[in-house]
Amino acid sequence: MQVVGTVRVSGCGAVVAPSRRQCRVSAAVLTAAETATATRRRVTHSMPPEKAEVFRSLEGWARSSLLPLLKPVEECWQPTDFLPDSSSEMFEHQVHELRARAAGLPDEYFVVLVGDMITEEALPTYQTMINTLDGVRDETGASACPWAVWTRTWTAEENRHGDILGKYMYLSGRVDMRMVEKTVQYLIGSGMDPGTENNPYLGFVYTSFQERATAVSHGNTARLARAHGDDVLARTCGTIAADEKRHETAYGRIVEQLLRLDPDGAMLAIADMMHKRITMPAHLMHDGRDMNLFDHFAAVAQRLNVYTARDYADIVEFLVKRWKLETLETGLSGEGRRARDFVCGLAKRMRRAAERAEDRAKKDEQRKVKFSWIYDREVIV
């Protein structure tokens, strides 16, 4: 049995949360596994060497069908398109207008916006993670291989996201930028452990899910910004969400090709990542004070409906439909069919679990937590 096809239910120890309510909400958002990766049985280089030929055979396809999803730099938006023009005589007035709009946003909104920005700023970790994947990594740092070109150019496009949000935070005057910057530095130094095992089958399942999750989160921060009267910030977050959707399309296409060429291996890889649960990129986030910072951020995101357990289930359901897993038959082993059935039934089970968690959370006493990002002001979690 090939290692890539082994479906493992990896053990995950629960994180001790500050309250019963927090524990339940975090469980609903599936963060217990995310902050407990130290207990995951580590596996490396799980793709059999012969599987690398699958990715070599896809290089022509990647060049013609994947790379066109990247935009030429001259056609891309840049952070300065949305921010006050520092060369303009109206700069101070534009900053004043930005700060006036920001004043109408509640503290809890800034918690999720800062959390999203910090997640984007850890981009060096994500490029590093993709370059751990066997068969698709950038072997020289400037390789012309289409997989390497994709990774570098994807990184360049993503780099604008944290950049624009960070500059907005700085100009808004609403957040403690030193604590935000410390959190970014801690997060990049901590890295991430998504459980992808240097295996591009697992890696591209992960990125397909994660890009959609990020698009959902940015789309919802756009919705909330508009509801609070900041149309410029709403356009900013919406533009970032559009980038994420385009990137999600690309990664989803890769998995489609894997299902075409190696349906059993791809199906087992999808089930493997679903068993492990998708680890959020910033799951090791902390600010030097709050070691449960990611759980607290995730709880606020859940409460504001920015990213919830229901969103997780919706993404699973979307990918099942996109990849046509319910009708996948040809090329599947018995284990592959069991993996397919598990994945296809997962969203419904997760929604039931989320409903139970939400009902229990409503009965718990509300609790406030201080966030260093907003000068230790308290927010309900």
UniProtKB/Swiss-Prot annotation:
Keywords: Chloroplast, Fatty acid biosynthesis, Fatty acid metabolism, Iron, Lipid biosynthesis, Lipid metabolism, Metal-binding, Oxidoreductase, Plastid, Transit peptide. The keyword Transit peptide applies. Signal peptide: none annotated. Pathway: Lipid metabolism; fatty acid metabolism. Fe cation 1 binds at residues 120, 158, 161, 244. GO terms for biological process: fatty acid biosynthetic process; fatty acid metabolic process. Binds 2 Fe(2+) ions per subunit. One of its GO terms (molecular function) is metal ion binding. It catalyses: octadecanoyl-[ACP] + 2 reduced [2Fe-2S]-[ferredoxin] + O2 + 2 H(+) = (9Z)-octadecenoyl-[ACP] + 2 oxidized [2Fe-2S]-[ferredoxin] + 2 H2O. One of its GO terms (cellular component) is chloroplast. The keyword Plastid applies. It is an enzyme of class 1 (oxidoreductase). Fe cation 2 binds at residues 158, 211, 244, 247. InterPro entries: Fatty_acid_desaturase-2 (IPR005067), Ferritin-like_SF (IPR009078), RNR-like (IPR012348). Its main location: plastid. Its cofactor is Fe(2+). Residues 1-26 form a transit peptide. Its EC number is 1.14.19.2. It is found in: Plastid, Chloroplast. Homodimer. Belongs to the fatty acid desaturase type 2 family. Converts stearoyl-ACP to oleoyl-ACP by introduction of a cis double bond between carbons 9 and 10 of the acyl chain. This is Stearoyl-[acyl-carrier-protein] 9-desaturase 1, chloroplastic.
